[in-house]
Design a protein with these regions (language model features):
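Structural core segment of the AMP-binding/adenylate-forming
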Residues: 1-54
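Short beta-strand->loop structural element characteristic of the AMP-binding/adenylate-forming
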Residues: 1-16, 88-90, 117, 139-145
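Residue-level signal for inorganic ion chemistry
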Residues: 6, 15, 37, 137, ...
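Conserved S/T- and glycine-rich ATP-binding loop of Class I adenylate-forming
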Residues: 15, 73, 79-82, 115, ...
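Adenylate-forming
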Residues: 15-26, 119, 144-149, 160-172
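Conserved pre-ATP/AMP-binding loop-to-beta segment of ANL
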Residues: 39, 57-78, 85, 108-114
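Conserved AMP-binding A3 loop
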Residues: 74-98
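Conserved AMP-binding/adenylation subdomain of ANL enzymes
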Residues: 97-114, 122-162
Length: 172
């Protein structure tokens, strides 16, 4: 499948996914170089899968910072593959930081903002929204899927100052 292709193409050794996605792709370990499959969530996991929450438990203050060359590879974003297999676009740490900073500046984001979104974080736009929330200190209300009624309730409940979405989300 697509995850297997991307994991093999980029040489991934670890895949981190939501519980549901991790369950649906657990065969990727047998078909690629992936050694670990890590899942978010509280649900029980099958043997051979690691819990993200368990990995962090008790270690919240033990992360060491590392020096990173801003021009080194940060992310490989994959195209949709409309003309064949998906193609990886290599982005440096500088690329990501500047994109996040410029988007925050253009959208006038600040730590006083609350953004509601259902954009998937692995998608480029979703990643920029998530990273922008981290950079500016704004509150991020992230929904696992787009449902117009749920989103509208969330905007009201959280007194959102921003909604981030793709054009089809604004047509409801």
């Amino acid at each position: 499948g697509e995850v297997e292709f991307v994991a093999t193409d980029c040489g991934a050794s670890v895949v981190i996914a939501s519980h549901d996605k991790a369950i649906s792709i657990q065969g990727v370990k047998e078909k690629s170089e992936v050694r670990e499959l890590i899942a978010f969530g509280e649900e029980a996991l099958p043997a051979g899968m690691l819990s993200f929450n368990d990995l962090l438990a008790g270690n919240e203050d033990e992360f060491e910072t590392v020096d990173v060359d801003t021009n080194s590879l940060s992310t490989i974003g994959y195209t949709s593959g409309t003309t064949g297999h998906p193609k990886g676009a290599c982005l440096s740490h500088r690329n990501i930081l500047l994109n996040v900073a410029m988007t925050a500046l253009m959208h006038q984001r600040s730590d006083r903002d609350t953004v509601v979104t259902a954009l998937p974080c692995p998608h480029v736009y979703g990643n920029v929204v998530m990273s922008g929330a981290i950079q500016t200190g704004m509150t991020l209300v992230l929904h696992p899927a787009f449902d117009e009624k749920t989103i509208m309730q969330s905007i009201q409940e959280h007194k959102a100052t921003l909604f981030e979405g793709v054009p089809t989300m604004f047509m409801f």
